[in-house]
Amino acid sequence: MWALTVFVTILAAAIPITGVTGVCEDMAGNGRAPGEVWTEDSCTLYECGEDDSGELNTLFVAGCPLSLEIPKGCHYEPRSGNFPYCCPLLVCPDYVDKKNVRRRI
């Protein structure tokens, strides 16, 4: 068998905390400094950064795909841990020497 973990990157604007410059606000309302990276319970990786003008803070988000077309004979296996290890693992049969093996690509 072979296995594949896929994640996508999405850009989303973050709202700076009122009265505070140079910070992004996480989902819990905590201030995050530019360049700071953290994960949330939703299996998502966040990074606080500045846009090209240097004035606005931008939250760069990477997360697991919501859905992908699953090839015939394949299935997703749930996983746990911090991003990206919490993303489901796509497992497919791979017939090598008539054995089923798992391979991460």
Curated annotation (Swiss-Prot):
Q: Which GO terms describe its cellular component?
A: extracellular region
An example Pfam family from this entry, by short name, is SVWC
SMART domains found in the cross-reference section: SVWC
Q: Where is the signal peptide?
A: 1-22
Give a brief account of the tissues where this protein occurs. Answer: Expressed by the venom gland.
The protein's UniProt keywords, in alphabetical order, are: Disulfide bond, Secreted, Signal, Toxin
User: Main location per UniProt?
Assistant: secreted
* Cellular location(s): Secreted
What's noted about post-translational modification? Contains 4 disulfide bonds.
List the GO molecular function terms.
Answer: toxin activity
Q: Please state which protein family the record places this protein in.
A: Belongs to the scoloptoxin-16 family.
Q: What is this protein called?
A: U-scoloptoxin(16)-Sm4a
Whose protein is this, by species?
Answer: Scolopendra morsitans (Tanzanian blue ringleg centipede)
